[in-house]
Amino acid sequence: MARYTQRPENALKRANEFIEVGKPLRALDTLQEVFRNKRWNYAYSETVIEPLMFKYLYLCVELKKSHIAKEGLFQYRNMFQLVNVNSLENVIRGYLKMAEEHTEAAQAQSSAAVAVLELDDLDNIATPESILMSAVCGEDAQDRSDRTILLPWVKFLWESYCQCLELLRVNTHCEALYHDIARMAFQFCLKYNRKSEFRRLCDKLRKHLEDICKSSNQTTGVSINKVETQQLCLDTRLYLLDSAIQMELWQEAYKAIEDIHGLMALSKKTPVPKTMANYYQKLAMVFSKAGNQLFHAAALLKLFQLTRELKKNLTKDDLQRMAAHVLLATLSIPLPSAHPEFDRFIEADKSPLEKAQKLAVLLGLPQPPTRVSLIREVVRLNVPQLVSEDFRNLYNWLEVDFNPLNLCKRIQSIVDFIENGPENALLTPYIQSLKDVTIMRLIRQISQVYESIKFQRLLQLASFCNIFELEKLLVESVRHNDMQIRIDHQKNSIYFGTDLTESQREYRPDGPALQSMPSEQIRSQLVNMSTVLTRAVSIVYPNRERDQRAKLRNQMVSQYHEIKDREHQRILQRQKIIEDRKEYIEKQNNAREEEEARRQEEESRKAKLAEQKRLEQEQEERERKRHQNEIQAIREKSLKEKVQQISQTAHGKKMLSKLDEEGIKKLDAEQIAKRESEELQREAKELQSKLKSQEKKIDYFERAKRLEEIPLFEKYLAEKQVKDKEFWEATEKTRIENAIAERKDAVAQQERLKRMYPDRDEFLEALKKERASLYVEKLKKFEAALEAERKKRLADRIVRRREERRQAFLREKEEERLRKEEEIRLAQAAEERAAAEARRLEREAEDEKRRAQYEKQRAKEEEAERKIKEDRDRLSRELASERERTEKERDTWRPRGGDRPSASAGGSSEWRRAAPAVSERNDRGGERIERGGDRVERGGERIERGGERIERGGDRDRKDNEGADSSWRVRREPDTQRAAAPKDSGAPQSRDDKWRRGGERDRDFRNDGARRDRDDGPRRDRDDGPRRDRDDERGGFRRNDGPRRTDEPQRETGGNWRDAPRHADRENRRPAGERRDRDVRETRGDQRGSAPKEAASGGGGGNWRNAPATREEKPAAKRDQAQEKENKAGDDGEWTSVKRR
């Protein structure tokens, strides 16, 4: 079964309970179970986990369990390094603080223990045990105490630092904390003098830096390319360098210098001058401790240059002090060996040249410095002129003047000046090197003056050197083959340059020199001879060389003219090749960069895919764990409920008391139930056995024993009662005696105090008299002040009450005014509401009246439309019957005319006499048509005089009956018949005149409609949409009659009208609006009594249709006039209601 896991807050409470009962290990196990479960990573925030973590680390520190603390810290980092970095920082700092406090307490305890041991016995300080321990182990009491008490805590603190550094080394959010902990670790090593731990710490930090540099191209983690990271690493290495110098670990200091130089070279930003000055200062110190005087002087020179150029507030004394330091360090450099190539025979990892080149890189020099180059640089910077007179003389004596007899004496004066001057404390380490350089200068200068010299004489000249040191220097000079020296101990002499065949190099002295050595002169004899002979030849033949030069010049010029074109082409070709090569290289580089970019993109894509896959796997793993945790929680809950249920019974408590927590966690619900049943059975068996044993004991023997015990118990109780009475009486007697004695003492005390009564009474009387006079004075003052205050308050109250009454009066007056204004306002508002209500009722009445008029008008319009429709149907039927009759009559007279193509006059008269009958019938039919048209037109007039919607209704009616209108209206005569019409007829003389008159009528009609539609008052409830009868595309009364009907009878004389050509009718056709206006005009003209049209003479032409129709004058009906007035009146007042509806 899975292990039981508590919630974090419950685990914290349980851990506190274990700590209170003195079980910290059990408390740590309880908290560790929570961390190992990992369930809290996804369910709780840092506010819940942080107290738990502090308690967990506290227990780890108390129990010195650094590995357990590391596990918890790593779990906490994984949870909160991206969520709440401050919480992680607080936890780590708190952990380290607790470890440091315990370590300091252990140190204090160790010192106290040693002090106690030392002060234990002053008469016997050296005990036999201490003597034996010191002889065996070689340690004192303090060392042994530290090893026993302090060392475990030091080890724990060191492990804590290492764990925190390992924890934070790849977290970009905790870089500052990482470097702070590194500095704390350096301080730890300094405080407890842990050199081996300091070396391991340096190696660890260097390894971390290498890992950062290797993984700098990754998208996550710490990147060395960031400026902040570089600065933090640089500051940490500078602190490491200071700590290494303090602990005198020069190898670690040199490695730190290499790291610092690498970081400064990697940074794109130039380090600040302060950092560079600190770097050069520490570098010079490391070189000095390493015994490398050459690079020590070079570092000081770089520091001097930097300070002189960038420090603006540099005083003259500081500049002189720094210049003296640089000059003395440079002059203290040992004279270089003439044959450093001997070092190549010594097996080493790196040659001296490579080492020197590496050190020069640390100083930012292009090549390793030499003593000569440094002295030249010192002179260039005018350093000898900046120092004091003594140091300037030192430079001249060593590097300029040639005076071997007084050299050591002069240098000894400078040495004494340095040793005696307190301000020259920094220059004291250079004294021995300066003496060695002086001795070497002395030997070289002596070798140029003497061939041999006595040892004693040389010792006199070298005043600060003994015979052994001098001999050692001589041997070193010979060893490096710098000089030819032979020591003759038998004669106690020294010989210089006696062998003239041993000069193997060109001697170039770097200091003051008088002449060359004899061996050097022999070696350069041929060279000198060549030089002298060349000079002699130039003097004997002064023009030979000039002629040779001119001849050589002419040859060169001629040769140049011969090859200049070829060389020019070659140069151009070479330039072209170079350009092509550059283009090729550039293309190769571009291709390589593109390939690299593609490769990096592919790697990045693969990395993203891998990261995505990893995240998916982690998500799946989390889901799986969460599912397992849920199942585990359910099981644990059921187990907990089962345990609680069992613990409520006596046998269950007994069964659980036999099991510890680990045992309970290992069991499941079934096993616990099984244990419970077993416990019940066992208790039942024990109860049965107890009952059986009791049955055996309850017998007569037991009763007899108890009967015998009764007298004994009675006797014991009687004796005990007597003893208790005696004890009470004695105690009571003692109490009474004590009370009597106390009363006697009290009475005696009272008698002694009674003698003080007179004095007491006198004192009280005097005190009362004094206080009474003071009381009377104060009472009078109080009463006077009270009376004044009472008068003042009465006056103030009078004034205040007057003001209150005045304010009350003004307030009542103002309230009365406001009340009256409010009444007036309410009355006005009531009147306005009544007026508004009356206006509203009036408007409603008017609206109702308009609505009734509109309904009445609408009923009239519907009646007119119904009549128009009935007339149209009737006219259509009459026209159809008339057409049939016309067809029949045409068929009757046409054959008769055809039988007599050349008839006589009488026959012609007979044929013509038949026409009037037809004409009469036609006239009657035309009269009916005209009457029908009159009715239709009158109906149209009524519709047109109506409102806007009525006009549109009439227009729609005319459009719908387009065919019928064209059938019953009076036909237009041909042009020839109109021309033959009588002059006195009322018909128009021509088609143009007729059209013009129709247009005037149409314009009048539109103007009349515009006057009727004008609204002289305000328009209410009006829809301002576009009016269909005023459309800009159709005009006021324009209508589209469409194509003419093809079944319309033809106007030509003779023949069938169906066979007539259409183009003739199309040419004579007029616009529909014009034809309508003409028909209206003709109809109204007939009503006004105009004369009917008459045919011209001889106009019959054999076709009865060409005869003019006879029209009768019809007076206008009074009913129609009255209806027209009523419609017009209704239209003037109620057009808005019609439009709205």
From Swiss-Prot:
Pfam families, per database record: eIF3a_PCI_TPR-like (PF22591), PCI (PF01399)
Highest classification ranks of the organism: Eukaryota, Metazoa, Ecdysozoa, Arthropoda, Hexapoda
Name this protein carries in UniProt: Eukaryotic translation initiation factor 3 subunit A
Function of the molecule: RNA-binding component of the eukaryotic translation initiation factor 3 (eIF-3) complex, which is involved in protein synthesis of a specialized repertoire of mRNAs and, together with other initiation factors, stimulates binding of mRNA and methionyl-tRNAi to the 40S ribosome. The eIF-3 complex specifically targets and initiates translation of a subset of mRNAs involved in cell proliferation.
Origin superkingdom: Eukaryota
Region (Disordered): 588-631, 829-1141
Residue numbers of Phosphoserine PTMs: S908
Major localization listed first in the record, in broad terms: cytoplasm
UniProt-listed Gene3D superfamilies: 1.25.40.860, UVR domain (4.10.860.10)
GO molecular-function term, one example from the UniProt record: translation initiation factor activity
BP-aspect Gene Ontology terms: formation of cytoplasmic translation initiation complex; regulation of translational initiation; translation reinitiation
